[in-house]
Design a protein with these regions (language model features):
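Conserved structural core of kinase catalytic domains
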Residues: 1-35
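A short beta-strand motif that forms the metal-chelation/ATP-contact edge
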Residues: 4-7, 69-74
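Short, flexible loop/turn elements at secondary-structure junctions
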Residues: 9, 65, 76-77
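Conserved hydrophobic alpha-helix
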Residues: 42-46
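Catalytic-loop of the protein kinase fold
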Residues: 47-58
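Conserved protein kinase catalytic/activation segment
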Residues: 60-72
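C-lobe/activation-segment region of protein kinase-like
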Residues: 71, 75-170
Length: 170
């Protein structure tokens, strides 16, 4: 089964790569920072409503510059880590998806988190994710030992772990 949606812009993956493709255009960095901020705010609003996406990867999030609107595609019902709330899963999956790209500036991820922090539930969600990550520290130590093999997902898992634990929640 499939469904068709109205045109809703290009993906975050597309926009995130524009500044590197056009290094002479200084306005692109500001535009992409804005897009990630808007996405973070949108995800936070979704979480404030008690909803979750299920797998918000960069390829499943679009931005329409004409309307300044984010659209989330390819929703999923299941989680693969039952200890995490659906909102915690969303946040961790997006951070992992972003860091999986490896060549993107961390500033866009911080812009996303700045937008996300406007949500009522943001602080509790971040604290929840940090608690679960700390509880499973040995898993991430093991993933870190695999870094010399350059497995994309385990490297991104370690980066996501480090990023989330370093976030200020005060």
């Amino acid at each position: 089964h499939y469904f068709v949606t109205e045109a809703c812009g290009n993906t975050l993956t597309y926009y995130s790569q524009l500044p590197a493709q056009h290094p002479d255009d200084d306005s692109l960095d500001d535009m992409v920072t804005h897009i990630f901020y808007i996405f973070g705010k949108t995800l936070g609003q979704l979480h404030d409503y008690g909803l979750s996406h299920g797998r918000p990867a960069m390829r499943d999030i679009t931005y329409d510059p004409d309307t300044d609107k984010i659209t989330l595609l390819d929703w999923e019902n299941g989680r693969r880590w039952p200890e995490l709330t659906p909102q915690g899963w969303d946040l961790l999956i997006f951070v992992h998806s972003y860091l999986r790209e490896d060549n993107l500036p961390i500033s866009y991820l911080y812009a996303m988190m700045n937008g996300y922090s406007s949500a009522r539930t943001a602080r509790d969600t971040v604290l929840h994710v940090k608690e679960i990550l700390r509880k499973h520290e040995c898993l991430f130590k093991f993933c870190r030992m695999l870094n010399p093999f350059h497995f994309v997902d385990t490297e991104a898992a370690v980066k996501a772990y480090d990023f989330m634990l370093a976030l200020k929640t005060e």
